[in-house]
Amino acid sequence: MALNLEDKKAVVAEVTAQVAKASTIVVAEYRGITVGDLTKLRAQARQQGVYLRVLKNTLARRAVEGTPFAELAEQMTGPLIYGISEDAVAPAKVLNDFAKGNDKLVLRAGSYEGKVLDAAGVKALASIPSREELLSKLLFVMQAPVSGFARALAALAEKKQSEEGAAA
């Protein structure tokens, strides 16, 4: 379906707004994917807070102009789906996990912190634990000494009570 000029401007404005608050963009080729599979991918992306969109490459290039992602424009050729997110790892993880189960989705490139990543770089980014996973690990590490100390105090109190009970 051809877009008129106003529709194109609206799409570019919407994508530009997403890019402005993004920390990562991942680009994948979707040639040959069924509508059902694409719908599943969109649902997974939505759950992870990833903006996922199939765009005309010229519109995507206009949306990234003047942003830290401008260098990614060189990689925008062919039928591509764009994953954009504030979370640095989420778009790479969503698209990489889906590509493992569907060989028709091919990771092409990405951009993170102003650097263009190749497919291997996107896969490496996808292997990093998410922010929530890292925070839960940090919380566990911080709680371990406190809970150990609390268990030691409880054991000491129990020992004192048993000694007092035996002495009486």
Swiss-Prot record:
InterPro entries: Ribosomal_uL10, Ribosomal_uL10-like_sf, Ribosomal_uL10_bac, Ribosomal_uL10_bac_type, Ribosomal_uL10_CS_bac. Pfam families: Ribosomal_L10. It comes from the Bacteria. GO terms for molecular function: large ribosomal subunit rRNA binding; structural constituent of ribosome. PROSITE patterns: RIBOSOMAL_L10 (PS01109). Keywords: Ribonucleoprotein, Ribosomal protein, RNA-binding, rRNA-binding. One of its GO terms (biological process) is translation. GO terms for cellular component: large ribosomal subunit. Gene3D superfamilies: 3.30.70.1730, 6.10.250.290. Transmembrane segments: none annotated. The keyword RNA-binding applies. Forms part of the ribosomal stalk, playing a central role in the interaction of the ribosome with GTP-bound translation factors. PANTHER family: 39S RIBOSOMAL PROTEIN L10, MITOCHONDRIAL. Part of the ribosomal stalk of the 50S ribosomal subunit. The N-terminus interacts with L11 and the large rRNA to form the base of the stalk. The C-terminus forms an elongated spine to which L12 dimers bind in a sequential fashion forming a multimeric L10(L12)X complex. Belongs to the universal ribosomal protein uL10 family. HAMAP family: Ribosomal_uL10. This is Large ribosomal subunit protein uL10. The lineage of its organism: Bacteria, Pseudomonadati, Pseudomonadota, Betaproteobacteria, Burkholderiales.
